[in-house]
Amino acid sequence: MLAYRLSADPSRRVLLIEAGKAYPPNTYPDPVRRQDLVGGDPQHDWGFYSEPGVLGRRLQLNRGKVLGGSSAINGAVAMRVPKYDHDRWTKAHDLDALNWQSSQAFYRSLERTSGTGGDGRDGCVPIHQLGDEEVSDQHRDFIASALAAGYQRTSGFTTGQPLGVGPYVMNTRMGVRLNTGMTLLGDAVRARPNLTIRDETLVDAVLVEHGQAQGVRLAGGAIILAGEIILSAGTYVSPAILMRSGIGPSEVLRGLDIPIVSELPVGRRLQDHPMVPTVWSIRKEAVGLPYPPIGAMLWTASNHATNGEADLNISTATLPDDGQTSDGAIFLLFAALVRPRSVGSLTIASRDPYAAPIIDLGFLTDSGDRERLVDGVEVIRNIARQQPFADMVGAELAPGAAKSDRASINAALATSVQSYQHPTSTVPMGGPRDAGAVVDIDGHVRGVKSLRVVDASIWPDVPSVATAFPTMMLAESIAARMA
């Protein structure tokens, strides 16, 4: 986003350094192009895993390593952040400029909507509100069963009143996931004489002298000088670069003999959405067409929700048959907790830029998160009892019908919880009165001139929606103020 916007000014010279490969816009390979292939492949992934933590097991953490980043491997959902998230950030983190009303203009400037998915028509990011006829048979039945369970139909997930069930707003066209390397950095933009893209190049650290960023050191030792540095390496990589640059918690830096440039709580507020899948057998003839794999959602409040926040996303997906069910097919109904209270952390154990960071998601460390995920399983079971799902499903395979009380469901969470792959807040933003912030509303790193961070790592806490599209909005707003 920033390379696209900033290079539109011919007086600027922009160098975009990409760790992965910069494919031409129309030649991305299938794992980072096809909508039905979510999560990428080893060639286009950073290969990160979480620490075992409370779960007692390591989770695979998919992050896109290609021009376009994780927008090239994600589910391509394009939703606006709800108003109560913005209200929380303005109050709790002294971020008046991040209010809901002001943010709507930046969403509109992004959106190129052909239907009712948003109210922007001339933006740079194509989005599309799926109709019932465009989702899979399974997702249509999910919508019908949720309505039968008493949930309302959403008036639109991008509206001010997004709660309810319905099809997603997507950043896809004709089965193609439209990542930012395609949409923002098309052929015409890449041809700008003031924009250079250097791919398959890893940044080691930012060089800082006398409190001012001077350039970056690459993993091979080469140095590139610049008037301003903007890190957009993502929630797991941007904080690692900062720490190797001497910006972070003093105990981490001293332990690695890294000179301290600015002592800041980098990596101390990692958040992600925990997701609990339930597995069901289903009659094979009832599966229908499984495409697209992501199509509809119920957004609702758990029984333990607070502050008027809708904290549960419920959805469904088909799984390949493993031959273990008599019904012939299996599918998922899953609940994601989108207002978690648990907080994780990220740190580094080495100065080696090729070493993966140490990532502790912190899942289930808050007892209230456990209760709300159990609420999610109960919502799922209620939906599964309704028509048309009731005639389609066979046995509940996991956590299983034998786990019928809340205590047994709670006990099973550690073996089942996964990441919804929406990590944020390792370099959190905040206003002058927010002592826990690392950057300000424009991504400026505290105590270091000419250095910004602009990516999902700077959200004050994890938004209540899929994070890619809102992060584009955040970058759009910062770019506008840089103009």
Language-model segments: residues:
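N-terminal glycine-rich phosphate/pyrophosphate-binding loop and immediately adjacent elements
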Residues: 1-109, 259-268, 273, 277-282
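Glycine-rich loop(s) and the adjacent beta-strand/alpha-helix scaffold that form part
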Residues: 5-15, 20-25, 106, 205-206, ...
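Loop/turn elements at helix/coil->beta-strand transitions in domains of secreted/extracellular proteins
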Residues: 9-14, 100, 192-196, 226-227, ...
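A glycine-rich dinucleotide-binding beta-alpha-beta segment and adjacent secondary-structure elements
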Residues: 31-34, 47-49, 164-176, 198-199, ...
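Conserved redox-cofactor binding core of oxidoreductases
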Residues: 91-205, 209-213, 277-281, 288-289, ...
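Internal hydrophobic alpha-helix adjacent to the cofactor/substrate pocket in enzyme cavities
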Residues: 146, 257-259, 378-389, 474-483
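FAD cofactor-binding and catalytic pocket of flavoenzymes
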Residues: 274-378, 382, 420-425, 433, ...
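A conserved FAD-binding loop/helix module that cradles the flavin
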Residues: 461-481
